[in-house]
Amino acid sequence: MKKWFPALLFSLCVSGESSAWNNIVFYSLGDVNSYQGGNVVITQRPQFITSWRPGIATVTWNQCNGPEFADGFWAYYREYIAWVVFPKKVMTQNGYPLFIEVHNKGSWSEENTGDNDSYFFLKGYKWDERAFDAGNLCQKPGEITRLTEKFDDIIFKVALPADLPLGDYSVKIPYTSGMQRHFASYLGARFKIPYNVAKTLPRENEMLFLFKNIGGCRPSAQSLEIKHGDLSINSANNHYAAQTLSVSCDVPANIRFMLLRNTTPTYSHGKKFSVGLGHGWDSIVSVNGVDTGETTMRWYKAGTQNLTIGSRLYGESSKIQPGVLSGSATLLMILP
């Protein structure tokens, strides 16, 4: 005879500190530094140094799903990552771009190098450090703490634009510098603030870069208007018109002149540079007789040279129409 015993199934759900959790807090420093670059000319790359200095930091971002406070009676794990997010380009007070390059990053790891706007330097430490320390594990934005860590300086170079006017410059460069603290309930937890989030963190640090430009190059005009005049639709094709501007340089220099189109052409012209004029017409644009849209000029000493921009009309009979033609391009002056 078989005896049946009732089976009991127990279901247990445990919550609290035994559940997996992660708390991430970012503390922003707010240093204001200045660096004197001295007298420079456009062909030089003046340098400046950013230093990580311990000090008071403010919480500017957090993401927490764990306990706010540790009482010292249970263990948790922590990892820290120092961040510096620095712009690749800034503008002078008179509207000229300065392009920032990395000269020496010390022991920092440079990441996300393909970003168009910012440099990302990271320094991680205290990986999987087990701790019992009592304290706040999820400080809120606006709360403060003191950071005592010290890290290597980062040295940058500045590429000056070829047509930067002479004079004194005081350029403010805002950037992010701070500490990511990550607390977790389990060994091996890893978290890094996403780069797109790091770019939006407040840039509460400021580098004031001071220098004096004592040698540059200047075009005689900031814009040129090339007029073809009133033409018959039957005789406009292949019509040529040009304008010349002079470029003066105070110092020896190699300048690359390159065109960028602002209006899309109607036709494909192979390697020739062209802009669209509307009504089925294009302009094939040349620089000093070269129709690829770029040329290089050399100044072996201070002086003035001429640059001729030419426009040759092109249209196919099946597409051209009468009307007012208009198009544009931007001429860049680029140092090597």
Swiss-Prot record:
Organism of origin: Escherichia coli
CDD domains per the UniProt record, alphabetical: PapG_CBD
One Gene Ontology molecular-function label: carbohydrate binding
Mutation effect (residue 127 to A): Abolished receptor binding activity
GO cellular component, one term: extracellular region
Main location class: secreted
Keywords for this protein: Disulfide bond, Fimbrium, Secreted, Signal
Alphabetical GO biological process terms: cell adhesion
Disulfide partners: 64-138, 217-249
Lineage: Bacteria, Pseudomonadati, Pseudomonadota, Gammaproteobacteria, Enterobacterales
Miscellaneous: Strains of E.coli that cause infection of the human urinary tract produce pap-pili (P pili) which are hair-like appendages consisting of about 1000 helically arranged subunits of the protein PapA. These pili mediate binding to digalactoside-containing glycolipids present on the epithelial cells which line the urinary tract.
Protein name: Fimbrial adhesin PapGII
Subcellular locations according to the entry: Secreted; Fimbrium
